[in-house]
Amino acid sequence: HKEFPVLYKGNMFKRTSDTTACIKAFVKNDWVWVDVVFRPQDLFKRGVHEWKECNPKLVKQGKKYFLNISYEQQVALHKEKIQHQRICAVDLGLTNSAVCSVLDANGTVLARKFIRHQREKDQLRRATNYLRKAQRQTGTASMPRYWNRINGLQKQILNDTAAQIIQFAKQHHVHTIVFEYLDKMRIPKGYYGAKKLRFKLHYWAKKGIQNKVEEMAHYEGMRISRVNPRNTSKYAFDGSGEVKRSPRGDLAIFSTGKQYHADLSASYNIGARYFIREIQKSISEKEWSALSANVPTLTTRTKQTLASFITLRTVFSFS
């Protein structure tokens, strides 16, 4: 799209009603006032009816022009103490768009949610296969039709996943949403063609979901936190050690023989690592060393699980 400079109120923009306005445009070598009509918006439904209206922008998309009006307000993020916090731990997996679990400061799992987009992901897989096949046949052709389809599906998955995460967090009165920290993209060996493209799309979608959720969470007064992602799926949440994956990869087989959803187990560990880190930050190094002696798994951050946090809570009480 093409974005024009900001239309400052008074000398570039004058609102005449809820759906009409005058904007100053350069037409035929002269600056003239042009009457425009735009679609009405339900500000009450969007929750911005009491917010300050900012200067609009004129945006051109294709052959159409849109008037983008933003609103602003000072929003205070929560300052709840760690012992009273309720978090939503989110694991952005492969088989599911996201797996969410709500935990409290005692390690109790209060709610769970699976967010799936099977239809969109199947369509995305077909679109990437068609794109790679067409590029092999034509060489370096850009293939805008396929890319428009892929980008549209990516945007649908991203926006819907972020909206469901925020809705789930609001439903359970969450204070903080916790994600894994995403480092630079490292493509594994043996990934090429459509498989390599899907890996890139999946990584870009995860980054986009985190950014979108952060924006929407701050709008609701929630905070965002990120934890070390290493081995969250590798270790069982019950402390039984490393897990094996089922042939499909969606189930984790514990050393005890128990089978559990791999992404759900990872979300428990993500939430536990957040609470462990916040407890460590709130006490002295001497106290933490004493606690680590009682709970040895705390010494290695990449091996911390929900069982580690529950054990920590048995020897540590909030002041």
Task: Name the predicted role of every residue range.
Residues H1-S319:
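Nucleic-acid substrate recognition interfaces
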